[in-house]
């Protein structure tokens, strides 16, 4: 059974978040949470919160046991970019 959780509008670059995602791919949930807790990256709390959400979805919606869960697939795609403009005279 596949359980899904999505995080949108994260404030960390996808290239940096992929480094954290690669650390927990294929690991059991407890091991992945321990890795994220001690990883000194800005994306670690975001990925940790996402993992907790996926575990909560599995337990609540599908009545699965947390001990049996592992990270089958995790990926990071690029989201929307903010265009920042400083209105000034350009001439």
UniProtKB/Swiss-Prot annotation:
Superkingdom, natural source: Bacteria
Q: Does the keyword Transcription regulation apply?
A: no
- Example of a GO MF term: rRNA binding
- GO CC field: cytosolic large ribosomal subunit
Keyword hit for Ribonucleoprotein: yes
InterPro entries assigned to the protein according to its UniProt record, in alphabetical order: Ribosomal_uL22, Ribosomal_uL22_bac/chlpt-type, Ribosomal_uL22_bac/org-type, Ribosomal_uL22_sf
Keywords, A to Z? Answer: Ribonucleoprotein, Ribosomal protein, RNA-binding, rRNA-binding
Name any Gene Ontology BP term: translation
Pfam families documented for this protein: Ribosomal_L22 (PF00237)
Q: How does it assemble?
A: Part of the 50S ribosomal subunit.
Q: What does this protein do?
A: This protein binds specifically to 23S rRNA; its binding is stimulated by other ribosomal proteins, e.g. L4, L17, and L20. It is important during the early stages of 50S assembly. It makes multiple contacts with different domains of the 23S rRNA in the assembled 50S subunit and ribosome. The globular domain of the protein is located near the polypeptide exit tunnel on the outside of the subunit, while an extended beta-hairpin is found that lines the wall of the exit tunnel in the center of the 70S ribosome.
Protein family (similarity comment): Belongs to the universal ribosomal protein uL22 family.
What name is this protein filed under?
Answer: Large ribosomal subunit protein uL22
| Organism encoding this protein | Clover yellow edge phytoplasma
